[in-house]
Structures are given as C-alpha cells and as structure tokens.
Amino acid sequence: MSKLKEKREKVAVSIERSSKEEAVELARVQIEKTFGKGSLIKMGESPVGKGIKSISSGSIVLDEALGIGGYPRGRIIEIFGPESSGKTTLTLQAIAEVQKEGGIAAFIDAEHALDPVYAKALGVNVAELWLSQPDTGEQALEIAEHLIRSGGIDLIVVDSVAALTPKLEIDGEMGDSQIGLQARLMSKALRKITGILSKSNTCIMFINQIRMRIGIMFGNPETTTGGNALKFYASLRLEVRKVEQITRSGSSDDVIGNKIRVKIVKNKVAPPFRKVELVIYFGKGISREAGILDAAIKHNLIQKTGSWYSLGDNKLGQGRESVIEYLSKEVELTNDLDKRLRKVIFNNFDQEDVSFIEYKENESE
C-alpha cells in the first residue's frame, strides 16, 4: 500500500513540475517578445555555463595563481600598487599574449605616458595596437564603452584610473573643490560597462594608484583612487608590490631588474589571496624562464639539490640566475617545459607520463 502511495506522490510531483515548466516557458516567450531573443535562457545553454575563457598573463606561475589559466574574459580587472611596481608591465605583457593568439587589444592612455619602445621590447606589436589618449575621463570611458560594444576587442587597458579627470574639473579653476566627481564618474561608467562586457567577451583592465587616507591611526591607511565602485565591480583585483632589486652577478650596484610580488586580493572566478613572485628585467619585461623554473620545481619536473638544478639525470646548472640564462638560450626546451607544465597544472595531466625532448647539458658550468 505504501509503494502505491509513493508512486502516486511521484506522479503528482512530476505533473506539478511539468505545469511549472510550462508556466516558465510561457513567461520566457513573453520576456523574449519584450526584451529580445536570449533575454532568458537556461544556464546550460549559456556561454556562462560552459566555463570562463582566459587570457594568459605571460607568466605560468601567475596563470596558475589566477586559477583559470590567466585573466578572465568578459570581466573587469583592477591592477593597483605603488609607483614603479610593475603594473603597466603586467598589462603590456597581457597585450602581447593576446596579439600572439591573433587577438586585438586597445590601450587607453589617460596618463599620456605609454612608451612604445618599451612596449615593443615586451613583445607588443605596436603597429597593430589601438591607442587612445583622451582629454577627459568621460571621453576615455565612452571610448572604452564603444570598443566593448563593437564586439571585436579582446583586451582593453585603461592607464590609469587616477588620470581619468572629469571634464568639470578640467574646465574649472585650479583651486575649485570638486569632491566626489571622479567617484561618481567611475560608478556610472562601470554600471554601463559591466552588462555589455560578458556579452562581448572583452576583458578590461584598469591600472590604479595608491593614496594614503588622512587621520587613519589603526589599520591600513592605503586606498585606491576613483571611489569604491571599481572594488565592487572588479572580478579580479591584483595588488603589485616591489620586493627587491635584482643585480648583475658579481656586482651590487648594477641593477638589472626587480622582483615583484603579486597578491590576488579579490577573485570571483577562483580562490583568492594567492601570492606569486615575478622577475621583471629592465627593457625585457616579465621573465618567462624564471616563472617556468619556479613552476617546474613546484611540480617536481625540475629537481633542486642545494644550488644545483637538474632535469631527470641531467644537470641544468648551478645557481638560479645561471639556470634562467640557460633556459633563455634553450628555447625549444623552455617551450617544451611550458607545454608540459600547463598540462600538469590545468588538465590534471599525469606527471609520470611527461616525457621531455632531447637536450644537451649546460656546459657553461
């Protein structure tokens, strides 16, 4: 008797669900008539339900820390930190990666300070990079909106939020008080941009600067410019800090680069609060080889014994800088390591099945 009752209850639930689905379908038809096709769809039929596409950062260790293999498409990203900490370098490296994949990038240079020589050294095809140097903050953000709506741009970089000066402030006198103008400008622009970003699959990066809050006795006195809107709308927030200077071997005065620390303070697409250290060489950008070496050691593809580094039974060299230099010369080996690491990290590849190309030992030691 209980089985019959249970069967009747299941049939009743099925009928109820069917009637609910019919009601939702009727509502969907009405919604699409009013707002257009695709206004309401099941998540399994939407690109949102099929995972988030990404743009490589140019560093495998940062790609791993970001959780999805790079910067998420269709999202807002904020990169902030003190001066000369590597913020612009990170964005230019991302532009170079987009262009390598055949994508299109734009740089909105509100600071009017983009160095094409440095960008080219980082691998950016400056001849194909779209550049805008707007006069006002409104102009910059409207240009960004038009580019996003075009659907043809893969990556937009805005440098920087602090330089997005409202027109009213530019037209006013130097001593005029213009409290909250920039914050209101950013809030309005981000409300408009957010909805169209996901549909166009465009990634937009905002470079931001740090300011000190007056009168803060306890806690962190640092804050970013442009109000709180960007903090809320950003899916990814990266804090960049300079850790130490890198000097040429055998010299304490010949500085050739910086080591920076990137902390992911907010991440809506993967676990946040991860930290990575990157090496930036002056005139060259982020060291791809240093990132590959760190990742290979972490995932046991390269073994470190004392100051010696080895790949299987073959020694790569003694000392970190020596091995990085060796990997920069052995391009085929470096590319192969990168390929294998990405399989290990992002595809749960069985490390025991990883086989490396033939290569010669580092004979410089």
From Swiss-Prot:
ATP binds at G81, P82, E83, S84, S85, G86, K87, T88. It is found in: Cytoplasm. SUPFAM superfamilies: P-loop containing nucleoside triphosphate hydrolases, RecA protein, C-terminal domain. Its main location: cytoplasm. GO terms for cellular component: cytosol. Keywords: ATP-binding, Cytoplasm, DNA damage, DNA recombination, DNA repair, DNA-binding, Nucleotide-binding, SOS response. The keyword DNA damage applies. One of its GO terms (molecular function) is ATP binding. It comes from the Bacteria. GO terms for biological process: DNA recombination; DNA repair; SOS response. Pfam families: RecA, RecA_C. InterPro entries: AAA+_ATPase, DNA_recomb/repair_RecA, DNA_recomb/repair_RecA_CS, P-loop_NTPase, RecA-like_C, RecA-like_N, RecA_ATP-bd, RecA_C_sf. Disulfide bonds: none annotated. Signal peptide: none annotated. PANTHER family: MITOCHONDRIAL DNA REPAIR PROTEIN RECA HOMOLOG-RELATED, RECA. Belongs to the RecA family. Can catalyze the hydrolysis of ATP in the presence of single-stranded DNA, the ATP-dependent uptake of single-stranded DNA by duplex DNA, and the ATP-dependent hybridization of homologous single-stranded DNAs. It interacts with LexA causing its activation and leading to its autocatalytic cleavage. This is Protein RecA. It comes from Borreliella afzelii (strain PKo).
